[in-house]
Amino acid sequence: MWFMYLLSWLSLFIQVAFITLAVAAGLYYLAELIEEYTVATSRIIKYMIWFSTAVLIGLYVFERFPTSMIGVGLFTNLVYFGLLQTFPFIMLTSPNFILSCGLVVVNHYLACQFFAEEYYPFSEVLAYFTFCLWIIPFAFFVSLSAGENVLPSTMQPGDDVVSNYFTKGKRGKRLGILVVFSFIKEAILPSRQKIY
C-alpha cells in the first residue's frame, strides 16, 4: 500500500517536470518565432484584439453580461491597440503599458466578482478568461523580447563598454590598459567572423 502511494507521488513529480519543460520549450520557440517575424506577429495580435472585441460584444448582446465589465474590456482592447502602435518596442515605463497592466487587474476583479455571483459552468468561465482576459496580455508578454534586436554578431569592433570607457570617444589613440583589456577580451571571448 505505501509503496504504490510513494510511486504515485514520484510519477506525479516526473510528470510535472516534463510538463514544465515542455511549456518552457514551447515558450522559447514561440519567443524565437515572434522575434523573427515581428510584422506577422503584430498582425496576429491585431486580429486577436479584434476577435476579443467581437467576443465581448457578443457576450453583451447574447448573454447580457454587465455593461461595466464589457465596457472595461473594450477600453482595455483600445489600450492594447495603443500598445500595438509601437510594437515590438514596448517601453515598460510608458503610461500605455502601465495602464494596460492596471486594466488587466481591474478586468480580473470584475470577472471574478461577476462569476462569483452568477453560475456558469467551468468551461464557459475558462473560455471567457482565455479569450477576453489572458490571450492578448500573454501575446504581449511573450513578445517583450522581440524589441531587443541587438545580436552579438551586429556589434561593431571596439563598441564594447570597456573600449568606450577608456577611449572616451578617441578611437585613434590606444592606451596601455586598453590594449591589455582588448587582448584579454579577444583571448577569453574571441569574436566570431563569418568566413565566406
From Swiss-Prot:
GO terms for biological process: endoplasmic reticulum to Golgi vesicle-mediated transport. Pfam families: Erv26 (PF04148). It comes from the Eukaryota. The keyword Transmembrane helix applies. The chain crosses the membrane at residues 3-23, 42-62, 70-90, 97-117, 125-145. It is found in: Membrane. One of its GO terms (cellular component) is Golgi membrane. GO terms for molecular function: COPII receptor activity. The keyword Lipid metabolism does not apply. It is a multi-pass membrane protein. Its main location: membrane. Keywords: Membrane, Transmembrane, Transmembrane helix. Coiled coil: none annotated. InterPro entries: Svp26/Tex261. Belongs to the SVP26 family. This is Protein TEX261.
